[in-house]
Amino acid sequence: GSLEIAHYPDVARQIAQRFKNINQVAITLRESISATHNNWGAMLYDVHSDTAVFAPMNGEQYEPYEIRNIVDRVGGGDSFAAGLIYAMTTKDFATAQDQVDFAVAASCLAHSVKGDFNFNSRAEVEALANGNVSGRVQR
């Protein structure tokens, strides 16, 4: 079914209230259409500024990647976490929006390879994050 993304910042606030030492909350947003067709995105919430950013965006509107013909869902979350950690620790990704954009693109592409290791290059991830905003991934 459809996700009500407007509620996810509230979920992140509840997590932050329970775990006082965290600065950010990241949540992946998966809409399962079928076993091989998912819509995929994420939210990154900053505790101190009480702001949330979503990815991918089409202008000001959240528009999840439409992943058809999923090869393997295993590793999608790990790939998101790895992409987010990489982006947060690399000076090229200065904003929370840049960071979550990269992480979501990395995890989206991970759905196109077998197993839980993301073989995609940084250039491939950035091409998706910066390129086709229609939300359709073709591999």
Predicted regions and their residues:
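Conserved phosphate-binding/catalytic region of the ribokinase-like
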Residues: 1-139
